[in-house]
Amino acid sequence: MERKAIIEFKDFTAHYTVQSKPTLNNINLTIYEGEKVLIAGPSGSGKSTLANCINGLIPFSTDIEISGSLKIKGKETKDLSVFEISKMVGTVLQDPDSQFIGLTVAEDIAFKLENNCVSQEEMKKKVNYVSKIVDIENRLDLAPYSLSGGQKQRVTLAGTIVDDVDILLFDEPLASLDPAAGKASIELIDKIQKEEKKTVIIIEHRLEEVLNCDVDRIILMNEGEIIADTNPNEILASNKLKECGIREPLYITALKYSGYELNKEMNLENIDKLKLSDDGEKLKTWYKSLNFNKKEREEDTLLEFKNVSFSYDKKKDILSDINFKINRGDIVSVVGKNGAGKSTISKIICGFFKESKGDILFEGKSLDGKTIKERGEEIGVVLQNPNQMISKTMIFDEVALGLRVRGIDEKEVKERVIETLKTCGLYPYRNWPVSALSFGQKKRVTIASILVLNPKVIILDEPTAGQDYKHYNEIMEFLLKLNKKGVTIILITHDMHLMLEYTDKAIVISNGRKIADTTSAEILTDKEVIEKASLKETSLYDLALKFKLEDPKDFVCKFIDFDRGARN
């Protein structure tokens, strides 16, 4: 049966008028009806611009010059209005909150239908139908903002498919979801694509998670061009992911370390179907050759929670009887599903919230009675979105702000800011406006503005969210450098790769309670903890189980230790 093209780019170029080079350069691409396609590439590769050309935001809402041809369902998009394109292409944005319009879930899903003057009876039928597809039918009367991250995404998806569009475009659907919600999201997208016969395009950095369900093709982009367009097995067998600065699945890295020559016949995209000609003997031999010297550290407790509970209304505890210790010089992850209480812990440490029971000790002394300002002299917090922290126009002034507010002499301010900018790799940009920086560079500015105050602890909320692998590594290697200088680092994260690769210890929160406090490898190989906290087993553990390695937990620990050494 002949495939029918639904999206066709021919010699397509897009050039923002403020930039010297085209963002998309001579793109030739055909996507067929019913396909599921993953578009991946580093930041600035042009994938978002490509997506915005498909959904009509370009050229209608942007000052950009385009040439060549783009057809959707056989129609030239430059001859269509945004409204006409929106009847064919539905977009689910990275941030669901930015898409909500209705006061209830039902109202939000019905928004498109109201615009199309659909009768109330027909509207109710359609809303009920799509709400069942996305498993949100029991929450139609709730406010969208009261839902969890995964539920919010289901609402935006329902509002997109209610109009029966043929093409669904997902912009980083996993960015704000915990691992279990992310897995459920990918499974839901797969279900809709198959059952509703939709064409699905996913833009995402987190390749391994997307490949939990089959995709037909992966399109790799770099510097405005398509550098690969083929099936997942061929991509994974090549080195194109690393060449593009995209993180390959950890089990693929393990196979390469073991000495396997990868090829598409090995069914690399799925561990369950993975075939190794020697039944894993090379993997077993490599595992036996690994040494793991656990670093023993002297216990020097810096921060301690003692029976801490917290409640907004003195009725229901958000946190219940939390106990843990963090040693000086640690890098620690705090993990758990959305709404578990992770961010509440950081807010209590900083004094934004007051614990209702228990005590928090810092260097052996209670923080009770310490003001936010006093705590801020020892403990710094970096928010997920740097734009929420930045208040000055120029980089130097932003980093200097905290010192100037404290009345530090201007000569000392200059010395400390320059030293910090050099440490953060920002000195060449010291006289630049903050607006000229990339998202990752802005993140470093916010870290610098905290670091200049010489804190003993830095708490970072989702430090790598939305970052491609190159910028992810830059931020994490930078944090490791700070850690080596004695700064204790606490990471609140959903990223299981980050937890495994960079933190020796993790604290797991579930429904307001601490359920684990041990090594990252121990946590991500413990089925009970994983299920309770909506985490996800590492693919390394699955690989070890499939090929019957002697001790799967030990394999994960040794791989992480070896990989750190290889990367450094």
From Swiss-Prot:
Probably part of an ABC transporter complex. Responsible for energy coupling to the transport system. The lineage of its organism: Bacteria, Bacillati, Bacillota, Clostridia, Eubacteriales. This is Putative ABC transporter ATP-binding protein CPE1583. It is a peripheral membrane protein. GO terms for molecular function: ATP binding; ATP hydrolysis activity; ATPase-coupled transmembrane transporter activity. Gene3D superfamilies: P-loop containing nucleotide triphosphate hydrolases. One of its GO terms (cellular component) is ATP-binding cassette (ABC) transporter complex. Keywords: ATP-binding, Cell membrane, Membrane, Nucleotide-binding, Repeat, Translocase, Transport. ATP 1 binds at residues 41-48. Its main location: membrane. Belongs to the ABC transporter superfamily.
